[in-house]
Amino acid sequence: VISNRAHLLEGKKLGESDKILSPNDDVNLSQSSNDTFPTAINIAAMKLITDNTLVNLRKLKNSLNKKSKEFNKIVKIGRTHLMDATPITLGQEFSGYVSQVDHGIKTIENALDHLSELPIGGTAVGTGLNTPKGYSSKIVKYISKNSEMSFKESLNKFEGIASHDCIVEMHGALKTVAASVYKISNDIRLMGSGPRSGLGELILPANEPGSSIMPGKVNPTQCEAISMVCAQIIGNDVAVSFAGANGHFELNVFKPLFAFNIIESSKILGDASLSFAKNCIDGIKPNKKRIEKFLNDSLMLVTALNSKIGYYKACLLYTSDAADERHC
């Protein structure tokens, strides 16, 4: 295409004479699709993850952190195995979410180092055949300057062309964050269930009417939306892992699959995190009456008596109260 365009710009017609630029000797000088393709994938992924994914995950973390501080004095019943457990503050519960997202951000940041290695200059199989001396270092510096990002030469261009482990590693980091965010969104959805027949401990923002047939119904659409995004990323990771295992000898030909999935996962995780923060987390309110009712009704408060009367006597109190409750 570039060669033909140059030919036309010189006033020539396609096919009437030799081309001004040779597609092989000029346009593709010192390059192979085997090293330029993975280089382009790494650049695109770095740009998207740095400018979108990480930026919006930090916004989600900040939104959760604000709610953690806001809810710090609201004591609620904890739940393990979906059953009543000992008390916890709503703020402490949200602080766990903050930590999950924070660890996820760090996991992605750590994976950026490997992703920043560019195999450009390795040409066909990683040896650098037909490239002039210093070509790789010069072009990597040029890419870094013009992209305003920090790139470096692949430590081993054979690995950079044949394996694409940097993509597998980075997508694994995205998958880890997706699993965390799925858990967070599901907790919030369950705590907001009801309003009368569910837990109803959280009041979620009413962003839109929830039903065309049930008046007044409000659905946790933001929780559901980001859950689907997380499921997609987890599915994409299976494909990326399989692609990573399919490098044969000096080349991995699954490059289009790597590119599609790392770009899609990075984009939808960033976009969904921003939407979840703005349209759900920022507007969450505690239903204090409901929280207090569950706390006061819970028999697990008896756990605090372990150090006073012992586990077995405390267990008898629990069993007795539970039996009385069942007979009511």
Region spans (language model):
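Low-complexity, glycine/alanine/serine/threonine- and acidic/polar-rich repeat/linker tracts characteristic
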Residues: 44-47, 51, 264, 268
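Glycine-rich cofactor-pocket loops
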Residues: 68-92, 119-126, 198, 202-205, ...
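Internal glycine-rich alpha/beta core junctions
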Residues: 1-33, 37, 55-58, 86-240
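Amphipathic, heptad-repeat-like alpha-helical segments
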Residues: 48-60
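Conserved small/polar residues in nucleotide/adenosyl-binding loops
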Residues: 318-327
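Strongly charged, low-complexity linkers/loops
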Residues: 289-315
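Long, amphipathic alpha-helical stalk/connector segments used for oligomerization, subunit docking
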Residues: 231-295
